[in-house]
Amino acid sequence: MYLNTFCKNELICGNTMRTMIKYLRQELKMSQKELGDKVGVTRQTINALENGRYNPSLFLAYEITQVFNKMMFKGDREKYFFMEEIFIFDDDYY
C-alpha cells in the first residue's frame, strides 16, 4: 500500500520512502549534511538513504520522522503528510 492519504501533490504520491525524505528535505531547504547532523549520521548516510543504497535502522527512521514532524509544525501541515506513514506503509521498503 502506498501513501496517498495525506499527500496533496500528485507527483509525490505513491513514491518510495527515499523519494519522500529527499522531497521533504528539499522543501524545507535543508542540506543532506544538516539533516544528517540533526539525526546523528553523516551526509553520506543521508545520500545513500535517498538513493536507495541504505535502509535505515528503526531508530534512524524514528529520528528522521521526528525531525520532519517538528519542522512541519512550523509551516502549512496540510500540504505535507506524516513521515511515519512512509516507514509503516511503504511496501518497497519491506
Regions found by a protein language model. Give the residues of each.
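Short alpha-helical DNA-recognition segment
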Residues: 29-48
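Short, leucine-enriched amphipathic alpha-helices that occur as contiguous helical runs
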Residues: 14-18
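Residue-level detection of the helix-turn-helix DNA-binding "recognition helix"
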Residues: 22, 26, 40, 51
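Hydrophobic micro-packing sites on short alpha-helices
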Residues: 61-68
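Short, charged recognition helix plus adjacent turn
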Residues: 1-13, 66, 73-94
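Short basic helix-loop element that most often maps to the first helix and adjoining turn
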Residues: 19-34, 63
